[in-house]
């Protein structure tokens, strides 16, 4: 795997993991607005991670062929 792709995956996963942690913390509070905001951030990070994985797989596939 190219280092560039590894770094992209690592960064996207780091962002997702941090957002997931913040969302879980928010779920333990009574502040519904905060929960909603953290869920929106988590959803965005999930989308970013999904797109990054797709892009990296396509790039690595091109690299292998």
Label each residue range with its predicted role.
Residues 1-28:
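N-terminal acidic leader/helix
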Residues 18-65:
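Short, charge-rich amphipathic interface segments used for partner binding and complex assembly
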